[in-house]
From Swiss-Prot:
It comes from Nitrosococcus oceani (strain ATCC 19707 / BCRC 17464 / JCM 30415 / NCIMB 11848 / C-107). This is 4-diphosphocytidyl-2-C-methyl-D-erythritol kinase. Keywords: ATP-binding, Isoprene biosynthesis, Kinase, Nucleotide-binding, Transferase. Pathway: Isoprenoid biosynthesis; isopentenyl diphosphate biosynthesis via DXP pathway; isopentenyl diphosphate from 1-deoxy-D-xylulose 5-phosphate: step 3/6. Belongs to the GHMP kinase family. IspE subfamily. ATP binds at residues 92-102.
């Protein structure tokens, strides 16, 4: 049995540089993966039924991104096969680590292989974009500079530090953050060279600090050890360390009511490694 990884991502910075006519925010960000994942198991079937055996509590199956990804691939390729899907869920919900998008991307990539539907990675990414702006970066599996609504991607080679990722016990509403009047929406455009020089910030962070004091507390705590930043709209935050031992030492001091993990930054996701092992 092969388990397929759905890795977490970090937004190393997040700027908003404007808005489109349809109201969507124009973003700049940089994605890097870590070696911490959900794990998905797929059992193809001949009956054409898509069965999600690990549904998320309170989420109707037709709204679940894994189910929607499988159905989308099945319909667009006129595939007659079905599948049973199980998920070993590790990534927190509403944490800004991309768990739902990553699960959807892994579903598209894995079923394209198992069902032998023959789509290219770029074709899968186009399908993924229909499910969410973050899905394509997980399909390509490369650390990337992103613009537009997050779908315009340019591969990046970045340092791969150890991270301590802390998730307070709260789910942040992305909608609440993006409609906040105090959110900065006119950042000066960033450059890749600026990112590599350490420039950039997460402009959602001040808004989330005000709305969710527990996230502010976590940021202040983690900043004692290394500069801390929020990923996406939170609630997860992270800090980089030169070595695993330093990250583990900070984790040992973390308040017990938060969730913390130590993970390695990866410019190539574990999903790419898995795909290579299948011979694709």
């Amino acid at each position: 049995m092969l388990l397929w990884p759905a890795p977490a991502k970090l937004n190393l910075f997040l700027h908003i540089i404007g808005r489109r006519e349809d109201g969507y925010h124009l973003l700049q960000t940089a994605f890097q993966f870590v070696d911490y994942c959900d794990w998905l198991e797929f059992r193809p079937s001949a009956d054409g039924r898509i069965e999600h055996l690990s549904p998320l509590p309170g989420v109707p199956v037709e709204h679940d991104l894994v189910y929607r990804a499988a159905l989308l691939l099945q319909q667009r390729t006129a595939c007659s096969q079905g599948v049973e899907v199980r998920i070993r869920k590790h990534l927190p919900m509403g944490g800004g680590l991309g768990g739902g998008s990553s699960d959807a991307a892994t579903t598209l990539v894995a079923l394209n292989h198992l069902w032998e539907t023959g789509l290219s990675i770029s074709q899968l990414a186009q399908l993924g974009l229909e499910l969410g702006a973050d899905v394509p970066v997980f399909i390509y599996g490369r650390a990337a500079w992103a613009e537009g609504v997050g779908e315009q991607l340019q591969p990046l080679e970045l340092p791969e530090p150890w991270y301590l990722i802390v998730t307070p016990a709260v789910q942040v509403s992305t909608r609440e953050v993006f409609i906040a009047p105090e959110l900065t929406r006119d950042c000066k455009p960033m450059t890749i060279s600026g990112l590599l020089a350490g420039e950039g910030e997460n402009v959602c962070e001040p808004v989330v600090r005000g709305l969710y004091p527990v996230v502010a507390d976590a940021l202040d705590w983690l900043s004692q050890f290394s500069p801390a930043r929020m990923t996406g709209t939170g609630s997860s935050i992270f800090a980089a360390f030169d070595g695993k031992s330093q990250a583990l030492a900070a984790l040992a001091c973390m308040p017990s009511h938060w969730q913390g993990i130590v993970a390695k930054g990866c410019n190539y996701s574990l999903l790419l490694d898995c795909l290579e092992k299948t011979g694709c």
